[in-house]
């Protein structure tokens, strides 16, 4: 019989790595989603979200939503604190910073899961509606510790890589000076932050794919 290797997200990555490492093991490789990152913070995702995904009008609505979350931050923070307390969430950074990171995660999460832009509240909607939307799309569970994603996060900083965040859409309202290195600062304890990124896996896989599947 024929064998197929397939996966989505990290599974999609694994499908590529498996094919590149053991090219004759299976007959067909199908990666539904397979980010091939060249650094801890790859740098291409931010540009894609800002200029390519969806339509120009949709990107404008998403950007305005990010800014509205920041404009309402003072009023939404009590709700955010109550939510985090209720769920017993703990973070390596202050809650005020985690709120901003939820807003930065918002466009990636929205597009990643195919959330319709039409679900974004209107400017006339109340704070509870806006807060519910933020929690539905970019819930702070993603940034808490202990984190169920820690094994992956270690892999990400060592060889899988990840995506970064652009502060540009919310620069006017955030106290964050930079998001560089956020993965280590937010996702990992001090004892696991010392690793450097090794691009060997990325380079080997790209070389194989360009040769075998140009």
What do these predicted regions represent?
Residues 5, 16, 202-205:
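Solvent-exposed, well-ordered amphipathic alpha-helical segments
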């Amino acid at each position: 019989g024929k064998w197929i290797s397939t996966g989505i997200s990290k599974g999609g990555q694994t499908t590529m790595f498996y094919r590149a490492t053991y090219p004759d093991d299976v007959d067909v490789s199908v990666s539904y989603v397979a980010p091939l990152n060249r650094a801890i913070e790859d740098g291409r995702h931010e540009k894609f979200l800002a200029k390519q995904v969806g339509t120009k009008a949709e990107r404008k609505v998403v950007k305005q939503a990010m800014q509205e979350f920041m404009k309402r931050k003072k009023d939404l923070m009590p709700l955010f604190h109550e939510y985090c307390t209720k769920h017993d969430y703990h973070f390596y950074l202050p809650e005020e910073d985690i709120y901003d990171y939820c807003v930065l995660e918002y466009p990636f999460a929205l597009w990643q899961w195919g959330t319709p832009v039409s679900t974004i509240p209107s400017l006339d909607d109340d704070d509870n509606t806006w807060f519910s939307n933020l929690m539905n799309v970019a819930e702070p569970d993603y940034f808490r510790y202990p984190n169920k994603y820690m094994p992956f996060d270690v892999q990400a900083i060592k060889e899988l890589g990840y995506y970064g965040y652009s502060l540009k859409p919310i620069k006017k309202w955030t106290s964050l000076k930079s998001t560089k290195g956020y993965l280590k600062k937010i996702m990992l304890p001090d004892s696991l932050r010392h690793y450097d990124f090794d691009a060997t896996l990325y380079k080997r896989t790209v070389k194989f794919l360009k040769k075998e599947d140009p």
